[in-house]
């Protein structure tokens, strides 16, 4: 896999709650280049399940409207890595989180790791935080991502409403 597992343990209960997609990065521009791009998804909430899986509530544009989806990330032996089934992506890796302010994750296709890689920076509030953005940028340096999108708080609030 392309994405290194840098987190030792992940406390799922602590990542629960509302989040905002403040920045995205991808290995290929077509994954993010338009509102309707396949992996341009806006995370709303993370919900741990009783079996230590993670339910991800997200929104994306489809047929000119914003739709809400639920994606189940199933736990693996490694705390920060989950198996998912979303489009061609089959792994979700949590790169880093401090639980209170930010969480970085990547989605990848383990069978073609260099082709489809998308990472996101989630924040708890809509406040732009340069320190977190720099940290996200550093976390991406070892990854084959060539496209980055940073949203300002106003854009985030408007990005996909239901």
UniProtKB/Swiss-Prot annotation:
Keywords assigned: Disulfide bond, Milk protein, Retinol-binding, Secreted, Transport
Per UniProt, what is one GO molecular function of this protein?
retinol binding
Cystine crosslinks: 66-160, 106-119
Instruction: Say which domain of life the source belongs to.
Output: Eukaryota
The record, for PROSITE patterns, names: LIPOCALIN
What are the record's GO terms for cellular component? extracellular region
UniProt-listed SUPFAM superfamilies: Lipocalins
Subcellular localization is given as:
Secreted
* Complexes and interactors: Monomer.
Please explain the role this protein plays, according to its UniProt record.
Lactoglobulin is the primary component of whey, it binds retinol and is probably involved in the transport of that molecule.
Report the protein name in the record. Answer: Beta-lactoglobulin-1
Task: Please name the source species.
Answer: Felis catus
Q: Which gene encodes it?
A: LGB1
